[in-house]
Amino acid sequence: MKLSHFQFNLPDELLAEYPAENRDESRLMVVNRAKGTIEHKMFKDVLDYFDEGDVLVLNNTKVFPARLYGNKEKTGARIEVFLLRELNAEQRLWDVLVDPARKIRIGNKLYFGDDDSLVAEVIDNTTSRGRTLRFLYDGSYEEFRNKLTELGETPIPKYISREVTPEDAERYQTIYAKEEGAVAAPTAGLHFSKHLMKRLEIKGIQFAEVTLHVGLGTFNPVEVEDLSKHKMDSEELKITQEACDIVNAAKERKSRICAVGTTSMRAIESSVSSARTLNPYDGWTNKFIFPPHDFSLATCMITNFHTPKSTLMMMISAFCGHDLMKEAYAEAIKEKYKFYSYGDAMLII
């Protein structure tokens, strides 16, 4: 398949600027692959599609406030610093993106906070916008991390043109987020409320938690027409033995296994044994799933509506079937479903 197969016109007004008032009251499109049908529901109706013993695979990564605003020494120019990942805790080295990047050179110092209580020095250029920063801070490591949290902003995606609000800190986070390390939320999980999780539990549905720390690569546009030439950024992945046991037992008894989000799907597809069972994993993955792809574990998935030419859309095409996905997306646009991080959801069965 080619990149051009994933182009479609998405009206700007369908990009969700805000989340639904209640998590589980966003809209849900249910796409049935066997029947080729499309239904329109509310997200809380997802309960009707699962039975006792079915498993939902959840990504329990937690978004940290990765967007900082600082000032450059001497000129005082305002610089956005986006924390990508910690390289060395002891030396307080971080891989970051800076904007505007043009004048941020090795040796420059950046000051953060009204009282300049946090200082960082640029020690390397990694890409055109990428830099390595060393933070200069006298307190303990815990105090340093608290300072980053205090100064940082929730990293809502750039397509959202409004200012960040205090509500974003809560709503751009799943209710089951535990392991801090993501710079973007695994957005399919945002639709689950505490009440819905409880109802699923009462019905006998099980949860298998995996951790994939979502990086900014999730938003990277694909720039090659031949998809096999696209390279994904690596993301940190951890799958415990406990999660494997839950998923493999469900597979054995032929229960439904549902990947909640593209990140959960990438996680489990990155660690499949030759017997097509789930293996524990602790490392990095750069797996890129695009058509054709033979999925080993999940029998259904929940996902949001994605932007044109995104790697996320390519995975959906591989799982759903390209023609049915195109039909579903055309229907979503016609019915004015909301797209992207704060948008509506799709259940593919």
Swiss-Prot record:
Keyword field contains Magnesium: no
Main location: cytoplasm
Protein name: S-adenosylmethionine:tRNA ribosyltransferase-isomerase
PANTHER family with a match to the protein in the record: S-ADENOSYLMETHIONINE:TRNA RIBOSYLTRANSFERASE-ISOMERASE
GO-annotated biological processes: queuosine biosynthetic process; tRNA wobble guanine modification
Catalytic activity: 7-aminomethyl-7-carbaguanosine(34) in tRNA + S-adenosyl-L-methionine = epoxyqueuosine(34) in tRNA + adenine + L-methionine + 2 H(+)
EC number per UniProt: 2.4.99.17
Any GO molecular function: S-adenosylmethionine:tRNA ribosyltransferase-isomerase activity
InterPro entries: QueA (IPR003699), QueA_dom1 (IPR042118), QueA_dom2 (IPR042119), QueA_sf (IPR036100)
Enzyme class: transferase
Family the entry assigns: Belongs to the QueA family.
